[in-house]
Amino acid sequence: MAAAVRAAGCLPALCSLQAGHFLSRQLSLNAFPVAATSFLAVKTALSHGSLSSRETRRNHCLTSLSHVLQTQCCVSSPGNWTGQQCRPYSFFTKLTAEELWKGALAETGAGARKGRGKRTKKKKRKDLNRGQIIGEGRSGFLWPGLNVPLIKSGVVQNIGQRSKEEQQKVEATMVEQREEWDRKRKIKVKRERGWSGNTWGGVSIGPPDPGPNGETYEDFDTRILEVRNVFNMTAKEGRKKSVRVLVAVGNGNGAAGFAIGKAADRGDAFRKAKNRAIHYLHYIERYEGHTIFHDISLRFKRTQIRMKKQPRGYGLRCHRAIITICRLIGIKDMYARVTGSMNMLNLTRGLFHGLARQETHQHLADKKGLHVVEFREECGPLPIVVASPHGALSKEPEPEPEVPDTKLDWQDVKAMQGLKRSVWFNLKRPAT
């Protein structure tokens, strides 16, 4: 480090030189004992006879001070001694551009975090470094190798300066280019419509990102099921806001999964959720590639789901989240009814829980040791064998008294007995 500059006031008396101009910070000699010792040694030597001559004292003083103050001053010549330090230090050099923009746009208060303030008067942040060229300035100097080519027509160019008119044209072009960039940024790309309106439910965000070993998931698609703002009360930051995203992924061929992503930014939450869902896949068995094997009735917490197997061409008549998940799985025909709580997370977990545990025809045939047959309306009384046991065939038929323990739904009972009618059934309408 350098010595103190308070000693600069003693230099004219000691060295018989003109005092230089020191643009430096005032420091104490006690803070730099090495520099103080060197300076005192110079002062002692100058007062004795060995260095009594005028020229000898001047040369020795300059040599000693150049070592003592080597980081604080520049010694040019014995006759013209000047010390200068250039250290730009201001309020704007202490803060980053991000912090300055936050102060200019008032984004650091509690009102900005809670969404207060009129959005119509809100200023937008600009990247002032965008479009800047190293060497360009208001003076219009031309620096070879920076803002102009170093060699032109085989000749090395010299430093020049634009005229006032040319400099005004260059600045006007830069302003026009920035305005064009701002207009392009305001243009919104219309994303795919989800379930309704401008909500995120049902919107596709593409396949998950490639894995660390180079594996890709181009045949998978990701659909958003729910986007919610959640808050956590912390001692340091207070009411801290986060975005929680529930997504489902699938390839349309039986492989599907779901996961939750949480982050302060919505885009980061989307990325976390879809990259996590690809690691929690379920394989869902499908009957003939279009529907479930049998009717399923389940209850997950406060949500009840009843799913029914349907013939080909029936379509998906379900809750909109169930329709989205079934398309990711590859189920094309199914009826589902949801009662109770409509919590999206419980609905998704209950649906995967029921579909992943359905019993296939082959598993039923192996368990019973009998052929599994299906009766279709178009085939009449002719049974169609859909599965046969792998082991020995049981010669004893299934006992008759065995009745499946199936809970009946009152709405289905009313429909079977003809008690279920429309609310408009007895309404008398005027003749038209």
Curated annotation (Swiss-Prot):
Residues 113-127 have a biased composition (Basic residues). It is found in: Mitochondrion. One of its GO terms (cellular component) is mitochondrion. Residues 220-284 form the S5 DRBM domain. One of its GO terms (molecular function) is structural constituent of ribosome. Its main location: mitochondrion. It holds the Pfam family Ribosomal_S5. Residues 110-130 are annotated as: Disordered. It comes from the Eukaryota. InterPro entries: Ribosomal_Su5_D2-typ_SF (IPR020568), Ribosomal_uS5 (IPR000851), Ribosomal_uS5_C (IPR005324), Ribosomal_uS5_N (IPR013810), Ribosomal_uS5_N_CS (IPR018192), Ribosomal_uS5m_N (IPR048584), Ribsml_uS5_D2-typ_fold_subgr (IPR014721). GO terms for biological process: mitochondrial translation. Keywords: Mitochondrion, Ribonucleoprotein, Ribosomal protein. Component of the mitochondrial ribosome small subunit (28S) which comprises a 12S rRNA and about 30 distinct proteins. Belongs to the universal ribosomal protein uS5 family. This is Small ribosomal subunit protein uS5m. It comes from Mus musculus (Mouse). The gene is Mrps5.
